[in-house]
């Protein structure tokens, strides 16, 4: 074994399990606390604004500018009370990652600073689309793109930033992200399904779509990661031995979860619960981890 590899193994084995986000409260006490959900909308918005958001989510109704200003003000009030200082339109471009540009709530006028967030800033941002879906040679003014608020997904706070789930389209309205095609397919499915359901019940206006969540991940110690140029450059294994196929290392579905992995899972669960993400099961995947 090379000296570099041995040093990486020694460093990895010296790392102890460590928790960073420890909550003593029951999950029900902090579930969704960082999400601007329906309950918080009722608290911070007027009934008119609340009804406008519900109509936009359920039936695709447009939100007029005056109501958008009220919604933005309510979001800003809630977010600043939670310690947020910036906001961003968060979207998933075709690069397979996320993209965002953080803007401050703070505005200075006559030497005085105050927080401001308008409806126009909530509804749309105008970023540079020349880098999507890949780095291009176009001038930025020749590649306009627009991120637009998607009210189907609730806004949330992450690292003192109000994250606004958004879609990303070109100047001509073409989809430049992963979400627009999904929303269009949901709309098409709802339209077709509603026509069928109306044969039995005329009161049905739309059909909603639900999907189950499953997230797999592989955890690699930082020392071992730094010893693998294939992981650093390609984000995948290119070199090395074939993995164990017969589960000799007890890396099966019901295998014991290592202490450091379990500590990571608990931290992940704590933050996920605060974002209103329901989690049910912890287990080893059927692969070396």
Language-model segments: what does each one mean?
Residues 30-143:
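Active-site core of metal-dependent hydrolases
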Residues 28, 88, 102-103, 214, ...:
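Generic secondary-structure boundary/loop-capping signal
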Residues 26-37, 56-58, 173, 244-253:
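Gly-rich Lys/Arg/Thr-decorated short loops/hinges at beta-loop-alpha junctions or inter-strand turns
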Residues 2-24, 140-162:
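N-terminal hydrophobic targeting/anchoring segments and the immediately downstream early-domain regions
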Residues 143-289:
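Glycine-rich, acidic/polar active-site loops that bind/position phosphate-bearing ligands
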Residues 14-20, 35-43, 179-180:
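Short acidic/polar alpha-helix capping motifs at helix-coil junctions
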Residues 24-39, 187, 191, 195-197:
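Flexible inter-domain linker/hinge segments
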């Amino acid at each position: 074994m090379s000296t570099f590899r041995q040093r990486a193994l020694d460093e990895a084995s010296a790392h102890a399990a460590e928790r960073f986000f420890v909550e003593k409260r029951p999950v029900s006490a902090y579930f969704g606390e960082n999400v601007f959900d329906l309950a918080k909308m009722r608290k911070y918005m007027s009934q008119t604004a609340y009804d406008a958001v519900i109509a936009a989510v359920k039936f695709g109704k447009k939100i007029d500018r005056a109501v958008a200003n009220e919604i933005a003000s309510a979001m800003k009030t809630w977010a600043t009370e939670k310690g947020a200082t910036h906001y961003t339109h968060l979207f998933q471009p075709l690069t397979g990652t996320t993209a965002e540009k953080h803007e401050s709530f703070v505005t200075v006028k006559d030497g005085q600073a105050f927080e401001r967030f308008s409806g126009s800033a909530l509804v749309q941002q105008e970023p540079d689309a020349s880098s999507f879906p890949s780095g291009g040679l176009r001038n930025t003014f020749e590649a306009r793109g627009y991120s637009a608020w998607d009210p189907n997904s609730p806004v949330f706070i992450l690292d003192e930033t109000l994250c606004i789930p958004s879609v990303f389209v070109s100047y001509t309205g073409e989809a430049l992200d992963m979400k627009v095609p999904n929303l269009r397919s949901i709309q098409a499915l709802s339209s077709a399904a509603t026509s069928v359901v109306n044969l039995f019940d005329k009161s049905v206006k739309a059909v909603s779509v639900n999907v189950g969540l499953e997230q797999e991940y592989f955890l690699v110690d930082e020392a071992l990661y730094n010893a693998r140029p294939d992981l650093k450059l390609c984000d995948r294994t290119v070199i090395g031995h074939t993995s164990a196929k017969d589960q000799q290392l007890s890396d099966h579905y019901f295998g014991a979860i290592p202490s450091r992995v379990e500590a990571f899972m608990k931290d992940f669960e704590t933050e996920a619960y605060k974002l209103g993400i329901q989690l049910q099961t912890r287990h080893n995947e059927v692969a070396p981890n």
